[in-house]
Amino acid sequence: MYTLARQLLFKLSPETSHELSIDLIGAGGRLGLNRLLTPKPASLPVSVLGLEFPNPVGLAAGLDKNGDAIDGFGQLGFGFIEIGTVTPRPQPGNPRPRLFRLPQANAIINRMGFNNHGVDHLLARVRAAKYRGVLGINIGKNFDTPVERAVDDYLICLDKVYADASYVTVNVSSPNTPGLRSLQFGDSLKQLLEALRQRQEALALRHGRRVPLAIKIAPDMTDEETALVAAALVEAGMDAVIATNTTLGREGVEGLPHGDEAGGLSGAPVREKSTHTVKVLAGELGGRLPIIAAGGITEGAHAAEKIAAGASLVQIYSGFIYKGPALIREAVDAIAALPRRN
């Protein structure tokens, strides 16, 4: 069924089909249809971050930026859902066209620029949803907020989403907001992490529960830079790391239509780079905080590959666009077949 739906959706522009897909998935959720149309994955419970996941395969941030289809995605069999990236104030993002399919490579290039309706809209959608599974909320800074003041935007969002999130992801790795990736390095990273940690502790006292913080990083760092990030996360007492966001590289899409568009590349071409980052992090962290792997999972075996590399959980986005909900079950089955899970 998804093959037919994809053929129809792919006749539309990428962003139009994205918006229509969110509407359809959301409507299916409200009517309770999605669970009837999608085979439920096998149960593969895992405990990470003090949270109980029915399976380790989640939806990556970016697909449902505003939380408009939480119930719909929740009925497809995901072990957890991450919505956003959301910013303190609504913003339109970059000019269109800004989203490009590269079907020959099972890839997508985007330069969306954190387009979203703002954190207050997202929270209204979260509170209206019936979904009671693990929900991550991914936060970022507004385009017109200077990088030097970025921490203010992150703290505004953290304050607002804390009570409604199972965990919060801090996005410092999108390539489509100028200067954002500089927050992954040196004193900028340390200052951001310290501010987040202090606010997390204050919010935990206020709300009576500690909501884990994850940092989402880029795949384009050197091994040495990744090691420094890992050390900073441990030192600051962060709870998890998500590896990775999209890449600025173009390996695997050279010469393809739209292959030279500006923006972040996701899908199959980023798989090896992302998995390598997971391996480096796993070696540096030594189990001190969990890794959530994202990037290039277009087959079940790719999800198992991420877990074998050291991840505790995985997330899918581009693979879901190309393969549909069947990828969730395929990924769960592949992870279940790993020796260490038997």
From Swiss-Prot:
Question: So where's the catalytic machinery, residue-wise?
Answer: 174 (nucleophile)
Task: For this UniProt record, give its keywords in alphabetical order, as a comma-separated list.
Answer: Cell membrane, Flavoprotein, FMN, Membrane, Oxidoreductase, Pyrimidine biosynthesis
**UniProt enzyme class:** oxidoreductase
Pathway-wise, it operates in: Pyrimidine metabolism; UMP biosynthesis via de novo pathway; orotate from (S)-dihydroorotate (quinone route): step 1/1
What membrane topology term does the record carry? Peripheral membrane protein
Q: What is its EC number?
A: 1.3.5.2
SUPFAM superfamilies found in the cross-reference section:
FMN-linked oxidoreductases
Return the CDD domains for the record: DHOD_2_like (cd04738)
Question: Catalytic activity annotated for this protein?
Answer: (S)-dihydroorotate + a quinone = orotate + a quinol
Show the GO cellular component annotation of the record.
cytoplasm; plasma membrane
Q: How is the cofactor bound?
A: Binds 1 FMN per subunit.
Tell me the residue numbers annotated for binding substrate. 65, 110-114, 171, 176, 245-246
Q: Tell me which PROSITE patterns the record gives.
A: DHODEHASE_1 (PS00911)
The family classification in the record reads: Belongs to the dihydroorotate dehydrogenase family. Type 2 subfamily.
Q: How does it assemble?
A: Monomer.
What does this chain do?
Catalyzes the conversion of dihydroorotate to orotate with quinone as electron acceptor.
- What is the name listed in the Swiss-Prot or TrEMBL entry for this protein? Dihydroorotate dehydrogenase (quinone)
Q: Which organism is it from?
A: Pseudomonas aeruginosa (strain ATCC 15692 / DSM 22644 / CIP 104116 / JCM 14847 / LMG 12228 / 1C / PRS 101 / PAO1)
Q: What is the lineage of its organism?
A: Bacteria, Pseudomonadati, Pseudomonadota, Gammaproteobacteria, Pseudomonadales
Which gene is annotated as encoding this protein in its UniProt record?
pyrD
